[in-house]
């Protein structure tokens, strides 16, 4: 079975390494952790970095697998997984997401609103150096070594891609919730209760609407899949076998 894990903002596929190490070599051999276009390398020609472009990119990754896949997403990766699974349930064997969801009542966090504002977003990005970003990631629950690694990839093309992505998503709560009833039933939500960006109530409402199991983690932040990699791995293995 093929598994695709999708990172979020402002991350790289390296954020999945603690989970991959825990899952073991047999599972990891059939696991793909692609970088979002524009994050690890310059934006491909013709790719506009909107939320719809990233969903199309993920669906193309799923189609290339040649069989239904297990999808796993965190942060923006979670939003993309839910949307892609809603649009193409025929390509999905199972899905699991953490610490971000398209939910009707959710309002974007403060940093997102800044990024969505022309000029202010560019200024904020310019003032966010790599050291500041590393400290911010660590404060939100990411291990310091990984936070430093992720911050080292804080490039001009990543910053531009992030601004375009967020500005395309001002109305995501309305635009991406109408098809949730099409989600495959084999889903799982994993959550860090102390997430400063997306409150656990968002997960509770989403899971109640979609009848999806919610696994909460006390004293865990936004990067729950890193902080609790062994626990998440155990849940995923059972989820895939069910």
What feature does the model see in each segment?
Residues 1-43:
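Conserved HGGG/HGGXW glycine-rich cap/lid loop of the alpha/beta-hydrolase fold
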């Amino acid at each position: 079975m093929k598994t695709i894990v999708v990172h979020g903002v402002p991350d790289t596929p390296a954020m999945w390494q603690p989970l991959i190490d825990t899952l073991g070599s047999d599972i990891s051999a059939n696991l793909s952790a692609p970088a979002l276009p524009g994050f690890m390398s310059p934006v491909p020609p013709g790719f506009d970095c909107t939320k719809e472009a990233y969903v199309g990119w993920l669906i193309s990754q799923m189609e290339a697998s040649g069989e239904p896949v297990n999808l796993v997403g965190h942060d923006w990766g979670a939003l993309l997984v839910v949307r892609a699974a809603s649009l193409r349930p025929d390509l999905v064997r199972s899905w699991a997401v953490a610490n971000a969801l398209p939910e009707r009542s959710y309002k974007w966090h403060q940093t997102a609103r800044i990024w969505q504002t022309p000029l202010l977003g560019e200024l904020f990005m310019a003032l966010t150096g790599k050291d500041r970003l590393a400290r911010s990631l660590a404060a939100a629950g990411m291990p310091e070594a990984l936070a430093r690694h992720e911050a080292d990839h804080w490039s001009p093309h990543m910053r531009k891609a992030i601004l375009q992505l967020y500005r395309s998503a001002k109305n995501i709560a309305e635009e991406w919730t109408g098809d949730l009833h099409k989600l495959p039933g084999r889903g799982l939500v994993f959550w860090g209760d102390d997430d400063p960006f997306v409150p656990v109530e968002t997960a509770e409402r989403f899971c109640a609407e979609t009848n999806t199991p919610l696994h909460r983690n006390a004293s865990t932040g936004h990067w729950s899949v890193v902080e609790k990699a062994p626990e998440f791995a155990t849940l995923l293995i059972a989820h895939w076998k069910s």
